[in-house]
């Protein structure tokens, strides 16, 4: 394949994020990269796509920058760009927990586990494995037996922990996320909250799936990614599907956004049911005047009314 997708982050000091963002955007555009990069005084968090030559130049440039010494890139081969545009944006945090007293992973974070060590932890009876991602990411794929926090945003995780603290306080905690950046901060937060034995999967699911020894074993489903691919394979030992179709509950790994632009909820839907229910998550959203599916497919008012009737057949 002629293209690659890079996933990376580095907690480091960037003195002037706004200036860095402006200059870095120009650099990325010169390389004809596309993607999303967040920068703040605490570091950089990015995912970009580009040709093999362009991504080689990009990785070399960051590795030669003293601020990013030791940066690790997770690399996926791709058939083309995984993004439509290139954005580099300054932010308060490169991953938002929105804590009053923020956690600095360079000073406080959980123990790092290699893929092999993490696999052993998955099999341990005295260890609780907590998924540090959002609920819709978990629903598409997760490690076998992992706890699913009921959250739609990373910043909601601290409140969820406070509500469920008593269940886990005396346990060994192991956490994981897509590439490792959320766990760096989340595991530090757990230590700050009084949890004593906290570890994290170094390099995240992306690293675990490429490890030649673990081969993604004990991962069920697919890994959600924040680009146009939507999902990627992880388990190369015994693949299973855990995602359930929004309307009929059958196995499904196809995510779409609800066609109501004011909702935009992510749902797992088959192509057949996307058409049947006008790309929406509910009758209310399907009948919305700005339904994107209706506009995209030039569906007449008569046909729209006909398909809206399909919602009556759903089990209440």
Curated annotation (Swiss-Prot):
<comment type="function">
    <text>Catalyzes oxygen-dependent 5-hydroxyuridine (ho5U) modification at position 34 in tRNAs.</text>
</comment>
<dbReference type="InterPro" id="IPR040503">
    <property type="entry name" value="TRHO_N"/>
</dbReference>
<keyword id="KW-0560">Oxidoreductase</keyword>
<feature type="active site" description="Cysteine persulfide intermediate">
    <location>
        <position position="177"/>
    </location>
</feature>
<comment type="similarity">
    <text>Belongs to the TrhO family.</text>
</comment>
<dbReference type="Pfam" id="PF12368">
    <property type="entry name" value="Rhodanese_C"/>
</dbReference>
<dbReference type="Pfam" id="PF00581">
    <property type="entry name" value="Rhodanese"/>
</dbReference>
<keyword id="KW-0819">tRNA processing</keyword>
<dbReference type="GO" id="GO:0016705">
    <property type="term" value="F:oxidoreductase activity, acting on paired donors, with incorporation or reduction of molecular oxygen"/>
</dbReference>
<dbReference type="InterPro" id="IPR001763">
    <property type="entry name" value="Rhodanese-like_dom"/>
</dbReference>
<dbReference type="Pfam" id="PF17773">
    <property type="entry name" value="UPF0176_N"/>
</dbReference>
<dbReference type="InterPro" id="IPR022111">
    <property type="entry name" value="Rhodanese_C"/>
</dbReference>
<feature type="domain" description="Rhodanese">
    <location>
        <begin position="123"/>
        <end position="217"/>
    </location>
</feature>
<dbReference type="InterPro" id="IPR020936">
    <property type="entry name" value="TrhO"/>
</dbReference>
<dbReference type="GO" id="GO:0006400">
    <property type="term" value="P:tRNA modification"/>
</dbReference>
<dbReference type="InterPro" id="IPR036873">
    <property type="entry name" value="Rhodanese-like_dom_sf"/>
</dbReference>
<protein>
    <recommendedName>
        <fullName>tRNA uridine(34) hydroxylase</fullName>
        <ecNumber>1.14.-.-</ecNumber>
    </recommendedName>
</protein>
């Amino acid at each position: 394949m002629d293209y690659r997708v890079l996933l990376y982050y580095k907690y480091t000091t960037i003195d002037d994020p706004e200036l860095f963002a402006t200059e870095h955007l120009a650099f990325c555009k010169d390389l004809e990269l596309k993607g999303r990069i967040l920068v703040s005084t605490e570091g950089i968090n990015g995912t970009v796509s580009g040709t093999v030559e362009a991504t080689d130049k990009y990785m070399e440039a960051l590795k030669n920058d003293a601020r990013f010494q030791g940066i690790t890139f997770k690399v996926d081969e791709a058939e083309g760009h995984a993004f439509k545009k290139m954005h580099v944006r300054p932010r308060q945090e490169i991953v938002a927990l929105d804590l009053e007293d923020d956690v600095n992973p360079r000073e406080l974070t959980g123990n790092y586990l290699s893929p092999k060590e993490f696999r052993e932890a998955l099999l341990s009876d005295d260890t609780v494995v907590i998924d540090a991602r959002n609920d819709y990411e978990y629903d598409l794929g997760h490690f076998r037996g992992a706890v699913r926090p009921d959250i739609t945003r990373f910043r909601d995780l601290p409140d969820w922990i406070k509500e469920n603290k008593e269940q886990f306080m005396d346990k060994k905690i192991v956490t994981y996320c897509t590439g490792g950046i959320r766990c760096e901060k989340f595991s530090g937060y757990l230590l700050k909250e009084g949890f004593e034995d906290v570890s994290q999967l170094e390099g995240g699911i992306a690293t675990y799936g490429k490890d030649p020894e673990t081969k993604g074993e004990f991962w069920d489903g697919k890994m959600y990614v924040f680009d146009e691919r939507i999902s990627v394979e992880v388990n190369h030992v015994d693949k299973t599907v855990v995602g359930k179709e929004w309307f009929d509950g059958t196995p499904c790994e196809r995510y779409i956004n609800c066609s109501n632009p004011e909702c935009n909820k992510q749902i797992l839907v088959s192509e057949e049911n996307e058409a049947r229910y006008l790309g929406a998550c509910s009758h209310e959203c399907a009948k919305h005047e700005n339904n994107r599916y209706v506009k995209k497919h030039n569906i007449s008012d008569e046909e729209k009314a006909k398909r809206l009737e399909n919602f009556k057949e759903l089990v209440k």
